[in-house]
């Protein structure tokens, strides 16, 4: 199992004061020192954290592959084609969201053209999708070589079942259920991910997973044999506040491997 470390939240901290501290390149090298297999970053249309200079510097200096998350916005795709990361993961994007809220809608008329353009520029293409059979099949038909399964529903259910989240202002209202119901739902979400991963592998797609994964919930996902890579960010950066980024990555690597 490989670990992609998303360092977007280091850039979020930098932008909180609009100064060049902490430096994103320093974060990249700390993640590498901790054993990361890949650096993941998201160049959003609103540039709320990562910007073009960050992307260029990380791609040029990273000793490990760079996975660049992006929307299908034409300006963004042109930047991706120019900078040529190892992989481009196409994600849905809404300006009002705090983070990516769900998998891609695969019925966009422009999506196939974007995938073709990225392939023509020798960039591996992954689609960030919900763990559904039809989405996996469509991803293959559209020309993707990889899918990243959205683990947000699993992660949210796990949190509501196994933490005090329900007693905070961050509780998830639609998951305000009895423990027995949450346990059934958690098993259902895990089964959905396993089945989607298996279908993907059978179709010849590489399978990654991510969103909301942390030190408590990652083991069940990392044990799925059809998944070859996990992309994890916020929980690692949060842990790094107390133990340092290198050590935070090391701890996650121990769980993932």
Curated annotation (Swiss-Prot):
- Give the species this sequence originates from: Campylobacter fetus subsp. fetus (strain 82-40)
Catalytic residues (positions): 42 (proton acceptor), 69 (proton acceptor), 211 (proton donor)
- Protein's recorded name: Pyridoxine 5'-phosphate synthase
The UniProt keywords, alphabetically, are: Cytoplasm, Pyridoxine biosynthesis, Transferase
Q: What does this protein do?
A: Catalyzes the complicated ring closure reaction between the two acyclic compounds 1-deoxy-D-xylulose-5-phosphate (DXP) and 3-amino-2-oxopropyl phosphate (1-amino-acetone-3-phosphate or AAP) to form pyridoxine 5'-phosphate (PNP) and inorganic phosphate.
| Oligomeric form and interacting partners | Homooctamer; tetramer of dimers.
- In the UniProt record, the gene name given for this protein reads pdxJ
CDD domains in the cross-refs: PNPsynthase
Q: Where does 3-amino-2-oxopropyl phosphate bind?
A: 6, 17, 212, 233-234
Q: Does the keyword Cytoplasm apply?
A: yes
Q: Per UniProt, what is one Pfam family of this protein?
A: PdxJ
Record keyword Cytoplasm present: yes
Could you name the domain of life of the organism this protein comes from?
Bacteria
**Cystine connections:** none
Subcellular locations according to the entry: Cytoplasm
Where does this protein hold 1-deoxy-D-xylulose 5-phosphate? 8-9, 44, 49, 99
- List the residues marked with site Transition state stabilizer: 148
Write down the NCBIfam families for this protein, in alphabetical order.
pdxJ (TIGR00559), PRK05265.1-3 (NF003625), PRK05265.1-5 (NF003627)
Lineage at the top is: Bacteria, Pseudomonadati, Campylobacterota, Epsilonproteobacteria, Campylobacterales
What pathway, per the record?
Answer: Cofactor biosynthesis; pyridoxine 5'-phosphate biosynthesis; pyridoxine 5'-phosphate from D-erythrose 4-phosphate: step 5/5
Molecular function (Gene Ontology), one example: pyridoxine 5'-phosphate synthase activity
